[in-house]
Every structure is written in C-alpha cells, then in structure tokens.
Amino acid sequence: MASSSVSSLQFLFVTPQTPSSLKPNSTLSFFSLPSSSLNLSLSSSSTGLCSIKPFESSFSTRVALSGFDQLEDDVEVAEQPRFSEDLKLFVGNLPFSVDSAALAGLFERAGNVEMVEVIYDKLTGRSRGFGFVTMSTKEEVEAAEQQFNGYEIDGRAIRVNAGPAPAKRENSSFGGGRGGNSSYGGGRDGNSSFGGARGGRSVDSSNRVYVGNLSWGVDDLALKELFSEQGNVVDAKVVYDRDSGRSRGFGFVTYSSSKEVNDAIDSLNGVDLDGRSIRVSAAEERPRRQF
C-alpha cells in the first residue's frame, strides 16, 4: 500500500458495558491504520501517564496495565464510531510524552470519555503536541473545557477548546470559551480577551501588531510573555488551522496604546523566538500572510 501523506493517528475507544454503574468496567478497542503508519504507545512509566498532576484513575490504571505484548491479531479492530462535533475537544500544547492513555485518564475526571486521538508525525513517530478528546455529553464537554483549559502537565499549560469548527467569524479567538465568540482553529480578527475569556470583551484593534514567521511550538502564552516586555498586552493569540489544529505560523498582539505598538515593532522585529526570526509590523485589516 502506498504510504499516506497524512500524520499517523492514535485512536482510543472506550465502550461502557454497564451504563447503570457509577464506575462501569470498560473495554478498550483500537482502530488502527496500517501498521507502517501507526504508532501505538501505552507505557506506564515512560509516557506522560505518570507525569500528569497527581490523581487516581482506575481507568488510566487499566489502560496502563493492559497487555503490552499482546499480538496485533488479538487487538479488537473496530470501525471508527461517529460522534457529533459538539462532543469533541481540541487539546493543544501537549508535552510530547503524553499519549492517548494519559490523556484519557485525565479527561475521565470530567466525565465519560468516548474517544481519544493523539496526533503523531508519520515520519518521526513523535507526538505533534495536540490531540482530540470526545466526551459523551455536551455538559461533560463544557466541564472538561472549564476544568482543563490551562491545566499544567509537565510544566506546560494545555489548551482545551470545545465545539465544532464554525464558519469564519469577525469576533473570534482560538482560546475562546462557549460564550459564542470562539473559533476552533483560531480567530482572524478576534476581539476577545487573552486566554479566551468566556463571552469575550472588546479590544482596540488599532493598537495591534501582526507577528509572522512564528515557530510551530510558539503558543499564546509564549507570545504574550515576549511582547509583555514592551508594554501592557491586552490580547495575544496565535492563529491555528481549524482542521489540523496546527499553528499557521503567525499571530496578533494587542496593546493598550499606540506607543507600545511602536516600541514593540522597533524592539522585537527580527528577534529570535524559538529558533526563528519573527516579523513584527502594524496589523492591517487584512494582514498580508507572508511565510
């Protein structure tokens, strides 16, 4: 079979056997792509399972202790179930050590986890630092977003964003909550507070700078930290692709005054951030996206 050009995916399905139980036993089944393009990693010690902030989860324990030496023929193969996009959460800024089992164990604290996908690079087999978690109900989705957006794992604050990828909106932000002003893949000309405050608040777009040539690993927090050196950052966001969840390599920072904007352009244009020389300029209504 010809090799696929997309990244390898790791799916973890959880199917409750006894719905009436408060803590039902679960069966685990894996949906797998051809073995050449799939990286299944279930380690009880070398993954992010043990590095997540301390909590006890019978589910994650069962995942960790499931047979590591189990033959491929013994793994149940199932078709990927279809779930409403409203039940899916995007989880970004994951440490590379966090796998599907660790992610499922964490999100189980917010409700019943239906499916977990951690996205892996096909060529390197390394986690790309983001994934998706599907819950059973919208209430559980909202609870998970509120509980885990900004939750720290291995020193990294993960991003959790709920809901399907909506049509483009003028008032949106990648980190937005469920107050109606959010975008799954990141806002274009978003008017929301930094960190995705629920409901959003207006910011003055005239005091905004465009930041290009960003490293894929730079997130909202890193952007805010750098630009805070030049003034009061009202809003800072990296723009993400709605389909892949990957950074598009640029973002926007909004200051409280035009002087801070000018200072940021003068001081930070060409500065090295995470190995790349960033471009900083005054933001236009429709910024030219040069990469």
From Swiss-Prot:
Span list, region Linker (Gly-rich): 166-206
InterPro entries: Euk_RNA-bind_prot, Nucleotide-bd_a/b_plait_sf, RBD_domain_sf, RRM2_NsCP33-like, RRM_dom
Protein's UniProt keywords contain Ribonucleoprotein: yes
Keyword Acetylation: no
GO MF terms, alphabetically ordered: mRNA binding
Principal location class: plastid
Gene3D superfamilies reported in the protein's UniProt record: 3.30.70.330
UniProtKB keywords: Chloroplast, mRNA processing, Plastid, Repeat, Ribonucleoprotein, RNA-binding, Transit peptide
Region (Disordered): 164-202
Gly residues: compositionally biased ranges: 174-189
UniProt GO cellular component terms: chloroplast thylakoid membrane; ribonucleoprotein complex
RRM domain span: 87-165, 207-285
Known function: Could be involved in splicing and/or processing of chloroplast RNA's.
Name of the protein: 29 kDa ribonucleoprotein B, chloroplastic
